[in-house]
């Protein structure tokens, strides 16, 4: 990527990085290690692995619902520094949506950095005052018979939503199922992808 291919924000980030390295404030190797960690060892692909395992292994799902930290560790995943990570399951009768009303508390190790909309004041306030309206804006319309639970993530407790497994996925293996799980579905503002959507 040449300098001319960079966006103005990328140019500023590169300039800031260069200044910090030149001034001895940042170790380039440590910075590279941090980037490598975020690219390979944290992110929504890890949360998707947890969800896919829960979809195919009822005993694992029970352990996940009982203690998400321990269940994630079973898969060799570090759920991050939050003392408590709670997994909740969306069903035909109950749907969960996660918000942090104070800032942007979020299970980064399993879902990666939070999306900009998750940190925005409109989402943080409307997810509490008008959660069905927010879901509708994301393309999720719940029936009147579905109980909607809004979960407030904090510094002490983070949430991972286990979305409903899509229909038509009985023959898929765990990796194929994980490809259907999106970050937004693990926050509760979207459904997982349909098998045809993931293949496209």
Which role fits each region the language model picked out?
Residues 1-200:
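Terminal, compositionally biased segments used for targeting/anchoring and flexible tails
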């Amino acid at each position: 990527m040449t300098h001319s291919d960079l966006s103005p924000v990328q140019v500023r980030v590169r300039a800031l990085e260069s200044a910090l390295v030149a001034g001895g404030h940042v170790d380039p190797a440590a910075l590279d290690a941090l980037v490598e960690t975020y690219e390979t060892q944290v992110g929504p692909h890890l949360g998707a692995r947890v969800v896919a395992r829960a979809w195919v292994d009822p005993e694992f799902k029970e352990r996940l619902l009982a203690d998400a930290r321990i269940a994630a560790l079973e898969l060799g995943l570090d759920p991050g520094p939050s003392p408590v990570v709670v997994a909740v399951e969306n069903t035909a009768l109950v749907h969960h949506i996660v918000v942090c009303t104070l800032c942007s508390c979020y299970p980064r190790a399993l879902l990666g950095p939070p999306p900009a909309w998750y940190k925005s004041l409109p989402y943080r306030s409307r997810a509490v005052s008008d959660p069905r309206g927010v879901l509708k804006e994301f393309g999720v319309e719940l029936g009147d018979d579905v109980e909607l639970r809004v979960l407030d993530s904090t510094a002490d407790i983070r949430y991972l939503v286990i979305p409903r497994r899509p229909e038509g996925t009985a023959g898929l293996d765990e990796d194929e199922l994980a490809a259907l799980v999106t970050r937004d579905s693990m926050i509760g503002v979207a459904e997982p992808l349909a098998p045809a959507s993931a293949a496209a």
